[in-house]
């Protein structure tokens, strides 16, 4: 699902929202989440999951072209951990073949 598909689905579920307002709501939520992660905060959405940061320590890597050693600095990367309800809902679909996203699929 893309951001524009999420906006369209939000607007269709709440008819009082015009597409512009749904787009603003999604952008505002994503901006708030991005800002929180950039400040080092953890985001928890009960029943869905949590977003946090994982630390990748500094290490010595290799330049694939020249083979020379390169110092790779420490960095933090966003990480999502699904909640129990989401894991169980997804696990209920185990064994089903993967398919292209269908916006009409409400499962």
UniProtKB/Swiss-Prot annotation:
InterPro entries: Hist_DNA-bd (IPR000119), IHF-like_DNA-bd_dom_sf (IPR010992), IHF_beta (IPR005685). The keyword Membrane does not apply. Coiled coil: none annotated. One of its GO terms (biological process) is regulation of translation. The keyword Transcription applies. One of its GO terms (cellular component) is chromosome. Residues 76-107 are annotated as: Disordered. SMART domains: BHL. Residues 82-101 have a biased composition (Basic and acidic residues). Keywords: DNA recombination, DNA-binding, Transcription, Transcription regulation, Translation regulation. It comes from the Bacteria. GO terms for molecular function: DNA binding; structural constituent of chromatin. Heterodimer of an alpha and a beta chain. This protein is one of the two subunits of integration host factor, a specific DNA-binding protein that functions in genetic recombination as well as in transcriptional and translational control. Belongs to the bacterial histone-like protein family. This is Integration host factor subunit beta.
């Amino acid at each position: 699902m893309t951001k524009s598909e999420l906006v369209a689905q939000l607007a269709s579920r709440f008819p009082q929202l015009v597409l512009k307002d749904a787009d603003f709501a999604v952008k505002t939520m994503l901006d708030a989440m991005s800002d929180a992660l950039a400040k080092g905060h953890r985001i928890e959405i009960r029943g869905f999951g949590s977003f946090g940061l994982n630390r990748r320590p500094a290490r010595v890597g290799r330049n694939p072209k020249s083979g020379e050693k390169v110092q790779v600095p420490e960095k933090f990367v966003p990480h999502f951990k699904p909640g129990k309800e989401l894991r169980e809902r997804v696990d209920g679909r185990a064994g089903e073949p993967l398919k292209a996203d269908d916006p009409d699929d409400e499962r």
